[in-house]
């Protein structure tokens, strides 16, 4: 009989540490869109796997790009 239960989950690694990205630019829309849900919300750390340091920088960059109208506040 097969074991039932939770499937094995891999530990998520920080995207920015793996790709050696030091600075998150608010003008890099393609990068920022990876961390925004389809509803326009910023995805939490537990979903994306980013470290606390880069999550804070990512949040600031997303909010800046919204302020300058590069990203929408909500989904269309």
From Swiss-Prot:
SUPFAM superfamilies: Ribosomal protein S18. GO terms for cellular component: cytosolic small ribosomal subunit. Pfam families: Ribosomal_S18 (PF01084). One of its GO terms (biological process) is translation. One of its GO terms (molecular function) is structural constituent of ribosome. PROSITE patterns: RIBOSOMAL_S18. Keywords: Ribonucleoprotein, Ribosomal protein, RNA-binding, rRNA-binding. Transmembrane segments: none annotated. Binds as a heterodimer with protein bS6 to the central domain of the 16S rRNA, where it helps stabilize the platform of the 30S subunit. NCBIfam families: S18. Belongs to the bacterial ribosomal protein bS18 family. Part of the 30S ribosomal subunit. Forms a tight heterodimer with protein bS6. This is Small ribosomal subunit protein bS18. It comes from Brevibacillus brevis (strain 47 / JCM 6285 / NBRC 100599). The lineage of its organism: Bacteria, Bacillati, Bacillota, Bacilli, Bacillales.
